[in-house]
Amino acid sequence: MLIDAGENKAGNPRHVSPNPNASRTPGEWIVDYIKTMAPVQKQKLDYALITHFHSDHMGGVLKMKNESGRYYNTGIITVAENLQIGMLVDRGFPDYNFLVNTEDKMIKNYFNFLHFTKRKMNVEQFVPGVDNQFRLLYDSTRYA
């Protein structure tokens, strides 16, 4: 499970330099780390959770479009473009009818990404207080 995958422009007060260096974007480093640490037979994420819609949690650098040209690769989008995600969970899907500036370029980019990738992965709204939204998918009886 991945919780948040942000990316900010240098100069943004929330910007943190990519580690180990700036030769890749933060999303690319996240993918590299997961692929390095995950078992070879399990090179994917079961869940990714976006806690809220700030660039340091979902990505806000809008400079490199994906192959289709329909949205920019940044943060969680870069992760999803390079690693299979079984379920993406955020706090507003599908109607986003709470305090979200739907005219914000970063939010529009995220919506475009969801629209054009909806057949590739499941997307679901986070439900506070439930204990079954994120289930152990492998050998769960071992942890019962």
Predicted regions located by residue number:
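Flexible, acidic/histidine-containing loops and adjacent segments that form or flank the divalent-metal
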Residues: 33-36, 40-47, 58-144
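Divalent metal-coordination and catalytic microenvironments
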Residues: 4, 52, 88
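Conserved beta-strand hairpin/beta-sheet module of binuclear metal-dependent hydrolase folds
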Residues: 1-44
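Solvent-exposed loop/turn segments at secondary-structure junctions
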Residues: 7-10, 52-57, 93-97
